[in-house]
């Protein structure tokens, strides 16, 4: 098979850069975070600008971490400042460098997801001027893969020059900086961008582009640490590998060559990760057989849709139950909008750390919640998990319920989720996260086609009598539409109104309760302000 050439492009600190472009700031020299501070300081920042990351902050820090870091920075600046005092504040790196008496500040921009989607669409339009849609895979709002194999000869330039031209065009039209990786497969392009390009100096035009093939990947990155820098290696994978003494991609590659009689062999990897070990071994060697054409042609065996939210604070059983019903109601409308029905509903209930840690009771708000948390901390004897911050928390509750037959009925789905919530949720605990899943999705057209297939079930006498009585009853009162069919017409009407007048143009009575979150979520995209 002929060698292919892929380009991966990542828009640097996309959300923060989009805000800086709108405000006329230099995205690389402005202390800016995108976060909704009305959600308290524990809210996760959607983006952190590059100049703030230079202080050692991660890209998805919480707002209180940003403020704590700036407090440290300003303590250091105060010691070094003439007179030992800081007068005034600035969020611009150039001003801070020029005036040591200024305190480092931060500009907090409220998320505007609609704006970011529009900017992303504009940049996608730039990609389309160079590469056809069938050769582009949109990986996320700020990242794409492009198969440029068939374009290099036509443009008369190499992949590096083509990537640079596209990146320069993006900057000229949006002032957003991008980084690129070039590889002989999508994995190498991604790793070149994520690891190599982000750690090399920019060229004269401020552009960072790195290129890898299988041999240069092994030479440059087989000893790279940490493993979590590599695509698809999360903290869980890294912990399992490091527990076995496998610290690098080179270690994994060598392990895959081991003999059956040796401890380190590919069987060890399959024992740790099952079938996913095959992908891990391929990536350790720099192999990736999947192409963009394969992605476009992929048809999953099963489909599902989900809706999840992390609540701004801990809530009790009844409030969480209300929110779960709201989410189920919204998800049912999403099913109707997509023209699909669900055969099964799933639910995950995540608990708050205050349910076990009495030191955190002060964060629970109302006296009622504090009483629940205090009782839970004393009485709870169920399974315990440890979150990413090392805190003990009750293990999340999970469950699913069969709908009997596929449905998109709001009433049916809402009742099923309510029944499931009451079955799996622990009334003693405080809830912080909820996730509702509609599974076993089937298109309405497919269901209609199934109904046209003759049913060859052998009837018995009672079936015939019952059917005859029902037929006479229908004839007596006149044909009426099924209740679910009537509800679907109502749902489609609601969707039409929402599209025209906004998501809060039609709301349910339960959305008016003080603790309901439906109206707030209707003004969000992906959990952030639209």
Model-based region annotation:
Residues 1-292, 461, 466-530:
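Gly/Gly-Pro- and Ser/Thr-rich, intrinsically disordered tail segments characteristic of DNA damage-repair
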Residues 8, 229, 237-431, 451, ...:
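DNA-contacting surface of Y-family translesion DNA polymerases
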Residues 18, 378-379, 384-530:
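Acidic, metal-coordinating catalytic segment for phosphate/diphosphate chemistry
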Residues 39, 153, 187, 310, ...:
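Generic "edge-of-domain/loop-turn" microfeature
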Residues 78, 153, 196-197, 306, ...:
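Alpha-helix boundary/capping detector
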Residues 182-187, 282-285, 341-353, 430-443, ...:
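A glycine-rich phosphate-binding loop feature that marks nucleotide/adenosyl-phosphate handling sites
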């Amino acid at each position: 098979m002929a060698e292919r050439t892929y380009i991966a492009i990542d828009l640097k600190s996309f959300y923060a850069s989009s805000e800086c472009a709108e405000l006329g700031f230099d995205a690389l020299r402005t202390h800016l975070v995108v976060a909704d501070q009305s959600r308290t300081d524990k809210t996760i920042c959607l983006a952190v600008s590059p100049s703030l990351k230079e202080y050692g902050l991660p890209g998805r820090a919480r707002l209180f971490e940003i403020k704590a870091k700036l407090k440290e920075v300003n303590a250091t600046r105060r010691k070094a400042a003439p007179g030992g005092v800081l007068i005034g504040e600035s969020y611009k790196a150039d001003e801070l460098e020029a005036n040591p008496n200024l305190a480092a500040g931060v500009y907090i921009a409220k998320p505007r997801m609609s704006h970011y989607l529009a900017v992303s669409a504009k940049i996608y339009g730039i990609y389309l001027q160079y590469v056809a849609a069938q050769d582009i895979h949109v990986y996320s709002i700020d990242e794409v893969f492009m198969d440029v194999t068939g374009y290099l000869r036509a443009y008369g330039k190499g992949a590096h020059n083509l990537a640079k031209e596209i990146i320069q065009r993006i900057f000229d039209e949006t002032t957003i900086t991008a980084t690129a990786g070039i590889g002989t497969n999508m994995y190498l392009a991604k790793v070149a961008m994520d690891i190599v390009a982000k750690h090399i100096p920019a060229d004269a035009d401020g552009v960072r582009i790195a290129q890898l093939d299988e041999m240069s990947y092994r030479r440059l990155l087989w000893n790279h640490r940490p493993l979590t820098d590599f695509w698809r290696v999360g903290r869980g994978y890294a912990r399992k590998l490091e527990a076995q003494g496998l610290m690098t991609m080179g270690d994994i590659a060598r392990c895959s060559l081991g003999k059956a009689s040796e401890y380190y062999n590919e069987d060890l990897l399959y024992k740790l990760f099952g079938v996913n070990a095959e992908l891990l071994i391929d990536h350790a060697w720099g192999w990736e057989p999947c192409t963009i054409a394969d992605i476009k042609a992929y048809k999953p065996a099963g489909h599902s849709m989900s809706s999840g939210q992390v609540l701004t604070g801990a809530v009790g059983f009844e409030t969480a139950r209300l929110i779960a019903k709201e989410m189920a109601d919204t998800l049912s409308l999403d099913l109707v909008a997509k023209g699909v029905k669900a055969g099964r509903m799933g639910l995950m209930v995540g608990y708050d750390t205050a349910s076990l840690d009495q030191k955190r009771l002060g964060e629970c708000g109302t006296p009622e919640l504090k009483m629940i948390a205090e009782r839970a901390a004393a009485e709870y004897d169920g399974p315990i998990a440890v979150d990413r911050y090392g805190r003990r928390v009750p293990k999340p509750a999970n469950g699913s319920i069969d709908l009997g037959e596929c449905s998109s009925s709001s009433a049916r789905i809402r009742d099923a989720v309510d029944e499931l919530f009451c079955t799996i949720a622990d009334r003693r605990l405080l809830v912080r996260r909820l996730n509702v899943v509609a599974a076993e999705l089937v298109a309405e057209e497919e269901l209609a086609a199934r109904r046209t297939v003759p049913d060859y079930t052998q009837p018995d006498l009672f079936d015939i009598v019952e059917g005859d009585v029902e037929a006479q009853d229908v004839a007596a009162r006149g044909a009426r539409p099924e209740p679910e069919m009537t509800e679907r017409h109502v749902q489609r009407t609601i969707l039409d109104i929402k599209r025209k007048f906004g998501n809060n143009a039609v709301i349910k009575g339960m959305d008016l309760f003080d603790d309901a979150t439906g109206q707030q979520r209707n003004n969000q995209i992906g959990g952030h302000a639209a």
